[in-house]
Amino acid sequence: MLTQYHRFSRFLNQTYVAGNETALFGLLNMPNDLVLVRHGASEGNLAFAEEKKGNYQVFTPRFMETHESKWRLTRDGRNQARAAGQWIKENLNIFFGAYICSEYVRAIETASLLDLPHAHWTRQVFLRERNYGRMSGLPYAE
């Protein structure tokens, strides 16, 4: 079993291939530019926004039983991801050396909906939000 150190070390020393392009991504080959895209609005974002308005109806049994890593994008979140991808294609028409996203469903959905040419996404455990264990997904009041 790989330790987190070994997984992180392997992550920092990978070669990425996209189409006819190859990029090294390691300590000595770090990119000059870094483009970060946050996931679009998710079920969790919607639930906590509604809670701030005093609406607790969104905290259904289904929502409460779903681990935060499985929260999906909302319709608005899918539209946000498509719009971000369109903006990137129109304004940053460059080859990216690596395409990396979190293993969370909402991040994977966002990556896919960006629809970037030649993107071969790598899921990385180190790119995720904080997890508060059993407290994750609870209304703030609790």
Give residue spans per PLM region:
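N-terminal mitochondrial targeting presequence
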Residues: 1-2
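Active-site-proximal alpha-helix that buttresses catalytic centers in soluble enzyme cores
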Residues: 6-21, 25-119, 123
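Short alpha-helix plus adjacent loop in nuclease-associated cores
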Residues: 127-141
